[in-house]
A protein has these predicted regions:
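Active-site-proximal region of nucleotide-activated glycan assembly enzymes
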Residues: 97-197
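N-terminal subdomain of nucleotide-sugar transferases
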Residues: 1-36
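Active-site and donor-binding regions of nucleotide-sugar-utilizing enzymes
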Residues: 15, 35-131
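Short, flexible coil/linker elements and helix-boundary hinge sites characteristic
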Residues: 27, 70-73, 172
Length: 198
């Protein structure tokens, strides 16, 4: 069966695009819906669709998109965002597998992928004895660092994503971020905190 995978908002990095390239090489069809200019920065062109409508238009849009593209799987970061909640509800009604990612329960160096959600929605057991039983017979994890990250690069990507999404909001007039505070205030507050640490 052909896997048609829809990528919604993910980490503010090229990570989702790299996953899609790998899955495409294995024969999957990968799609993306960009909700803001920051999304477009990390994935444009091939099989990407720009949603420029309002939040009120999103449920009907995503419902039609899932059916039109015969989506079999959805990959997204954080299931509590407005756009993601509606996509998940419609996916569950259609038997579409939803995989949620976040920055990992074990930090640094790990990223977590879970079916059906994370945290309170996680299917991962909470009892230590069940976790230990699941781990029996598994090899020791390879803790060798395979990828090197850069704080400066992460800051650059984050600022580029949020500031350009703010400045170029006119290109995606209906977009509403899940962030509680405007990025300018977040960056100013973070900068002041870092200065105080010196």
């Amino acid at each position: 069966m052909q896997r048609n995978i829809l990528f919604l908002q993910g980490p503010i990095t090229p990570f989702f695009k790299l996953i899609a390239d790998n899955l495409s090489a294995q024969g999957c069809a990968c799609f993306r819906i960009n909700l803001c200019f920051g999304d477009w920065l990390f994935w444009r062109g091939r099989e990407s669709t720009e949603f420029r409508g309002s939040q009120q238009q999103w449920p009907a849009f995503i419902e039609q998109y899932l059916d039109q593209h015969q989506i079999t799987d959805i990959l997204l970061l954080g299931e509590q965002r407005f756009y993601h909640r509606h996509a998940i509800r419609l996916a569950n009604a259609r038997g579409i597998q939803v995989v949620t990612t976040d920055f990992g329960y074990l930090r640094p160096d790990w990223i977590t992928f879970e079916r059906n959600g994370m945290s309170a929605n996680s299917d991962f057991p909470r009892e230590p004895e069940k976790i230990i039983a699941m781990a029996e017979g598994l090899p020791e994890p390879n803790l060798q660092q395979r990828f090197k990250d850069s704080f400066v690069r992460q800051v650059f990507w984050d600022m580029q994503y949020h500031l350009l999404s703010t400045v170029l909001h006119v290109l995606y007039p209906g977009y509403r971020s899940h962030q509680l505070h405007h990025p300018i205030w977040v960056y100013l507050g973070t900068g002041l905190r870092l200065l105080k640490l010196r």
